[in-house]
């Protein structure tokens, strides 16, 4: 698309500005209008007042006992500790916390292949029977606990065409959606990078994931948009959120490069990203999924403050 202001137009504007220099100096000396200075910008005036909710991913704090992590999370105003298995639910419930995204189940196929994790999952038809059984059990566990979200993965390509993988994922996931819909559980497939952390992972770009959501056609299947991972694969994070937020059920953070703190030591400007998420009217959870390089609880507290907009 051609820019609305060309280089030639810009040069003409600069030439005209020189002729108005004296007038500009006079205008600059005049005090600003108190009324105009107090008026909010259109973007801030349009922002929803309600803040989305905060969560933290358990695996990033493995050296911290879950009980201690839950206690600290509660004190920081974090409402969820996530990526937990059912045996961990009672611990966080003691502190009045939820699990905003429950960990995926894994199981062995009759051939002894462990499926359900990142590399081997829904893009293989031969895994579907095992996955359906494992996920139906986990869906019931999540619902019985009073939680609402369950993570899932595409699996790696392993030389499979992306379109074939898309079709296979849709076939398999549609088998468990009736139960998910009945129990009020949203399945969220995570977008992960295949460049640095998860080589060969299939659901590694937003358009692929969005197409899968459209094919499945259920409000109980959406995407987990991981800001760190998609910065590596696509960039253009804020525009992607603005254009596709209706397909996203959950968000993860992380500093890039390195997946450490989300502060000024990395390239993403999280306050602006959080404002973009808030502006969509999102009422779900944004989870901190960075690996602390400094004191873990101090870094977590700083991240939550940074993401409260």
Regions from the PLM with identified roles:
Residues 2-74, 146-148, 203-225, 229-309:
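Histidine-acidic metal/acid-base catalytic patches
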Residues 14-22, 48, 119-222:
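Active-site acidic/histidine proton-transfer and metal-coordination neighborhood
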Residues 60-62, 85-87, 105-107, 156-158, ...:
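Active-site-proximal loop/turn and secondary-structure-junction residues that shape catalytic pockets
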Residues 69-88:
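Catalytic domains of carbohydrate-active enzymes, especially glycoside hydrolases
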Residues 90-103, 185:
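Short acidic, glycine/proline-enriched helix-loop-strand junctions
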């Amino acid at each position: 698309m051609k820019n609305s202001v060309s280089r030639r137009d810009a040069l003409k504007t600069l030439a005209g500005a020189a002729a108005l220099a004296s007038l500009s100096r006079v205008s600059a000396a005049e005090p600003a209008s108190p009324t105009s200075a107090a008026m909010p910008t259109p973007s801030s005036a349009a922002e929803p007042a309600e803040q989305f909710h905060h969560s933290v991913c358990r695996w990033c704090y493995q050296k911290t006992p879950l009980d201690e992590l839950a206690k600290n999370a509660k004190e920081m105003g974090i409402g969820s500790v996530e990526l937990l298995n059912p045996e961990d639910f009672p611990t966080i419930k003691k502190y009045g916390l939820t699990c905003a995204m429950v960990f995926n189940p894994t199981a062995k196929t009759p051939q002894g292949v462990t499926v359900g994790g990142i590399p081997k999952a829904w893009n293989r038809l031969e895994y579907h029977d095992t996955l359906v059984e494992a996920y139906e059990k986990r869906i019931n566990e999540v619902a019985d606990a009073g939680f609402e979200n369950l993570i899932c993965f595409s699996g790696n390509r392993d030389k499979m065409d992306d379109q074939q993988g898309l079709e296979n994922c849709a076939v398999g996931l549609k088998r468990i959606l009736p139960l998910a819909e009945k129990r009020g559980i949203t399945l969220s497939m995570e977008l992960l990078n295949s460049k640095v952390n998860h080589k060969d992972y299939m659901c590694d770009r937003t358009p692929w994931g969005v197409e899968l959501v459209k094919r499945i056609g259920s409000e109980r299947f959406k995407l987990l948009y991981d800001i760190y991972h998609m910065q590596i694969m696509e960039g253009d994070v804020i525009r992607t959120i603005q254009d596709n937020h209706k397909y996203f059920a959950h968000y993860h953070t992380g500093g890039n490069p390195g997946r450490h703190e989300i502060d000024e030591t990395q390239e993403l400007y999280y306050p602006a990203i959080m404002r973009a998420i808030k502006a969509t009217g999102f009422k779900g959870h944004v989870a901190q999924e960075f690996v602390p390089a400094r004191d873990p609880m101090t870094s977590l507290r700083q991240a939550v403050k940074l993401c409260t907009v």
